[in-house]
């Protein structure tokens, strides 16, 4: 196998600490979290104490000033252990950068240290009942009234929505201006008129709280506008490459874990007097998956390298997201097949990982949208 060269000894020490933390604080409880539909709120505070949240933020805002590889380590370890209920990456690598890049100094100092410590859990509210991939179709509005914006509308499929203390809301400040009329706002969960709907029951990722959000005459200070009014769509487009890279990183880690589980299972499971791994079809399937995962790993690591250099462009990030998650789902399906009937039993991690993987091709921009982005760049 091709050795990975991106990570320093310091990164690997951090990886060891992340793995130890997750094996102690998350793995024993994840099954219960799947039943209740959300993870224990205390895990966020413990993760903050362990330095696992928003490590990339500058020290002046409570972070470590670390590079993105520390975020990648957390994503990979969460993915390898099948802990899909944990929304750390969305909080650290998707929401926090919006505040860092577009928030005022007052907003940064008010909120970012609380994100680092786990005192506040965050979410981003883009998707609506009638607007998914088409963000220009958002109907939620924000109308300036004196020194406040008044927000009305609804959101759905919001990850971390149930536990969120702070939400970035995508809303139209000028509904007639299309994409140029979109703005981003910070809304605290205890703001009057902001209600959380039911937690949504999903096919997979059952421990990840996913909720509906409702806004009825929600008043927020105009200072809670991120950046400039009407620039929200542009900000979203600038930040999406990192979001899509995080999905690809997690997808490859999940595929690698699934292959290892399947190697172990097929070596132990016997049929017709010999191990399943000794059958030619099994060996060929394992060889094919190992090769494709290796190809995916090299590509995603190169994307990580480009991202560290500030050179990861939108089409390449789209390639990583689409190809990485397609591969993840392909590998998980093959691994379930090699597990036979046991692969369809919820008590086996391969079954849960298979169910969890399917949505990877849908969120963060569907894979069809990814192909459209790639095609436009050709």
Task: Report each predicted region and the residues it spans.
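Short Ser/Thr-interspersed hydrophobic loop/turn segments at strand-loop and sheet-helix junctions
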Residues: 51, 74-79, 171, 187-192, ...
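Long, acidic (Asp/Glu-rich), low-complexity accessory segments flanking structured domains
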Residues: 213-235
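Short Gly/Pro-enriched turn/cap motifs at secondary-structure boundaries
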Residues: 88, 115, 130-133, 157-160, ...
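A short, Trp-centered hydrophobic/proline-enriched beta-strand micro-motif
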Residues: 118-126, 170
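Helix-loop "lid/cap" segments that line or gate small-molecule binding pockets
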Residues: 93-102
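A short core secondary-structure module
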Residues: 148, 152-196
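Alpha-helical interface subdomain recognition
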Residues: 1-86, 102-107, 114-119, 132-135, ...
């Amino acid at each position: 196998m091709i050795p990975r060269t991106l990570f320093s000894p310091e990164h690997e020490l951090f990886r060891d600490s992340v793995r130890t933390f997750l094996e102690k604080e998350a793995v024993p409880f994840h099954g219960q979290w799947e039943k209740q539909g959300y993870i224990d709120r205390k895990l966020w505070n413990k993760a903050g104490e362990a330095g696992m949240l928003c490590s990339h933020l500058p020290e002046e805002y409570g972070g470590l000033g670390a590079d993105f590889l520390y975020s990648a380590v957390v994503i990979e370890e969460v993915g390898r252990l099948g802990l899909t209920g944990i929304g750390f990456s969305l909080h650290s690598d998707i929401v926090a950068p919006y505040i860092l890049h577009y928030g005022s100094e007052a907003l940064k100092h008010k909120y970012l240290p609380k994100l680092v410590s786990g005192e506040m859990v965050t979410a981003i509210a883009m998707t609506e009942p009638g607007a998914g991939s088409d963000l220009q179709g958002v109907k939620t509005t924000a109308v300036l009234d004196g020194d406040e914006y008044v927000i009305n509308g609804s959101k759905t499929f919001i990850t971390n929505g149930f536990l969120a203390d702070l939400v970035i809301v995508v809303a139209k400040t000028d509904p007639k201006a299309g994409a140029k009329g979109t703005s981003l706002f910070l809304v605290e969960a205890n703001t009057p008129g902001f209600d959380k709907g039911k937690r949504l029951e999903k096919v997979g990722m059952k421990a990840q709280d996913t909720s509906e959000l409702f806004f009825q005459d929600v008043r927020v200070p105009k200072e809670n506008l991120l950046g400039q009014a009407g620039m929200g769509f542009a900000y979203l487009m600038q930040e999406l490459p990192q979001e899509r890279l995080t999905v690809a990183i997690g997808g490859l880690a999940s595929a690698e874990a699934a292959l290892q589980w399947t190697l172990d299972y097929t070596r132990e499971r016997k049929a017709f007097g010999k191990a399943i791994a000794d059958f030619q079809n099994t060996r060929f399937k394992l060889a094919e998956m190992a090769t494709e995962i290796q190809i995916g790993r090299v590509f995603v690591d190169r994307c990580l390298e480009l991202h560290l250099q500030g050179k990861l462009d939108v089409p390449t990030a789209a390639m990583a997201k689409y190809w990485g998650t397609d591969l993840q789902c392909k590998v998980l399906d093959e691994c379930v097949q090699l597990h036979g009937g046991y692969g369809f039993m919820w008590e086996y991690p391969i079954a849960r990982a298979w169910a969890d993987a399917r949505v990877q091709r849908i969120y963060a921009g569907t894979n069809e949208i990814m192909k459209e982005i790639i095609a436009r760049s050709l």
